[in-house]
Amino acid sequence: FLKRDGFSKIPPLNGDEDFGLVAGKDVTQLISLQVYSCVECGRCTEHCPASTTGKVLNPKEIILGMQSYLNESGPASDAPLLTEALVESRDNPPAKYMSMEAAFECTTCGSCEYQCPVGIQHLPIIIGLRRGATNTGAWEDNHGTKLFLALEKHGNALGLSATERDKFIQKQGFPIFDGTQEYCLWLGCMGGYDPKGREIIADFARVMQHLGTTFGVLRKEKCTGDPARRLGNDLVFQTMAEFGLKALEAAKVQKIVSICPHCVRTISNDWREYGIAPEIEHHSEFMARHKDRLPRQNSGESIVYHDPCYLGRYRNVYEEPREIVAMAGELVEAPRSHERSFCCGAGGGLAFLGEETGERVSHVRAAELVGTGAQIVGTACPFCNTMFRDALSSIGDAPPQLLDIAQLTARALPKMQETGEQ
């Protein structure tokens, strides 16, 4: 009964006076009930990608730190919940675990919540702490500042001019959505600006064309605001969400398909605070539904599939991408898969912050995937693809090939004339 409806549901923004979890007075009764329900088993920490790779973050100690704060300062206190002294707190466990350094090491993978036997929702608490630090200006990070400025100025997390997206659309020959097509193909930051993400979009577009599914793209599209939302910047997130909803409404979009689980999650859940977003699905769901009309490659190659956190634990989509992988080759399971999958390290905005402490999460996961002996690593998220691109290149002389499920499917399609550079 402790849980809100849905997995890791962040409470909606509550007016201009809601800055997040800044002090004791911001701690709700539900949060208090949850933190005092902790049985201190440590399963959340045991499965946390940040904690297990040598970071400061310890989900159990975040919960116990909230307990200690409420016991010592009280729920009406104005004292800050998070300590600002990052270096000074390292030798002081209570301060260390409740530091901004710890709060901003979370990848929001949700493994802690999945593992918790009493239903504590760690992520709304951690993101609430981030909101309190970011919205009040207490959190100062060069990477974070650069990200927020990129979103505000350019409308995408990569900080590139919107004309770059326009050029890509023209070279691919993508039609602009005008209300007559069945789907709006959502490019996202990675699909619209990242070279590898563009390859995935191009191949998925080929799949849709092969199926005879009509689609178009928005003339103007900005980031969903996912990294801003997870890092606690309410203003930037709200700006992105309102722009996106107005663009979809103006284009009379009814159905969206996206290659990015983060875009799917944000549009289907977080945007609903500001209006009713159209129906959206992930491209794995789309392809699985049409699998009987897609060619089988039967390459015989072994493919280990990595479950993205925002597709698996957040959306409960596990079998659909596996059905697509099995059509392309021999499916191999990683030691940690499905609900117990290990994060790539990109979520929660961390793809843009860098990783300076401990082992790189992506390298730990990549080594695990390589250890299966599979010839191909299959992904279903452009952020996972980006993280593994770097990680796999650092492992041995002949790393396995890295392909999105759309690319696996497109390999079996009839060859088409190239539409231009990506």
Regions found by a protein language model. Give the residues of each.
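Catalytic cores of enzyme domains
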Residues: 1, 281, 285-286, 300-314
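Juxtamembrane/interface segments at transmembrane-helix termini
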Residues: 1-6, 48-60, 64, 122-126
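Membrane-embedded alpha-helical bundles of multi-pass integral membrane proteins
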Residues: 1-21, 26-29, 64
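Membrane-interfacial helix-loop segments of redox and metal-homeostasis proteins
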Residues: 1-8, 297, 304, 323, ...
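Iron-sulfur-cluster electron-transfer modules
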Residues: 26-35, 57, 61, 70-266, ...
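The canonical Cys-X-X-Cys-His
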Residues: 41-44, 48, 112, 116
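Active/binding-pocket-proximal capping segment
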Residues: 54-72, 79-82, 322-328, 337-340
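Cofactor-cradling patches in redox/metallo enzymes
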Residues: 187-282, 310-422
